Every structure is written in structure tokens, then in C-alpha cells.
Amino acid sequence: MKEEEFPKKIADNVTMHSSNPILYVVDNFLSNDECDAFIEAGKGRLKPSTVISPDKHIQHKSRTSENCWIQHDASEILHEVSKRFSILVQMPIRNAEQYQLVYYKEGAEYKPHFDSFDFNSEDGKKNWEPGGQRLITALAYLNNVEAGGGTGFPELGVTISPRKGDVVIFHNALLNSESSLHAEINPRSLHGGMPVIKGEKWVVNLWFRENLRY
């Protein structure tokens, strides 16, 4: 059986980059006004980004950005965007965490990591509880970056270049693991925010969980 070749267009504005894990980019999913609305909703509230440690969230040299959390209905425009994200990934918006707005200044990055949780670790179990595993990541680029700042998937040999309005969708977990009752990390979903070489980068993350969050 012939292996699938990537990237490949699956719609006029959708490019598939992998089937394991599912990874695709939707061009111009967000309008300029919608991108700007996310940034305006979070400006003035940004704090240094953290990573998960066994007991708490801590700052770490592997993640040098700033972020804040934004509610799905923080404004009418974001409420409508939330509906579209739900339709895009075919999951209820109530399964999703709040939006995470992230700002990368020149030189900032987020080294390769997993979005899903390791249930074999104490911190993984703790973060798993409110909603279950992170199944799907929606990552939207809110501005054009002058140089650098791509999203790299080292296990796939894929780098997605940031372009304002584009959304990257990828699946994080193995749903049919025979060795566990829980959806486990797909090791091929390893990814990172590459260093911003020139300019700045604004993105928003939306993580969809197994179960309802509210």
C-alpha cells in the first residue's frame, strides 16, 4: 500500500501535513479584526509563561513567552469565533479550556513539548482531572512574524510558518491504546514554538479535552 504523501491540499484553504497525528492548517480561518480582538482582550494582562511541575506551574528557561487566559465569550466577536472553532474540530466548546493568548518577543521560544498529559506522573494526573486528556490543539497565528517563530514538529520533520489568520489543528493523544484506560500521549505530537528571529509573535491556543469543562 502506497504511503500518503504530505503536504497535500484537502480543500481550497486546508493543507494536511500528517495523518499520524492528524495535523492540518486552515488558511485565513480568522479575519484581521478577529485576530486583533484576541490581542486587545489580553493586552495589559500578560504574565511570564509557565510550565507544569509536579506541584505547581513554574517559570522555566524552556518557555520564554508571556501569556494570559481569555474566556470564550469575552466579547461578542470572540463568542462567534468560539462557535466556529467548535464546528471546525467537531467538539463542543464546553470541552475546551479558556483561550491562552501567548506573546513572543524577539528571541523568545517554547522548546519541544507535549500538550497532552502523562497520566503516569503526579502532575499529569492532577491536570487530567478537570476535563480529562487534551485531545486536540487549535493554534491560531494573530500576526505576521518578520522572521522565525514557526511551529516545529521534530518527529514529523514539519515546520509551519506563522501567518496572520491561519490556524493549525493537531491531535495530541492515542485514543485506542490497549495498554491503558486513558488516552495516552502520541509521541509524534511533539512540537515547539521556534525562536522569533525578528519582530514579535502573537498566538492563541485552544485545547479541547475529553470531557465537558463547564
Language-model regions, residue ranges each:
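Fe(II)/2-oxoglutarate oxygenase catalytic core
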Residues: 1-214
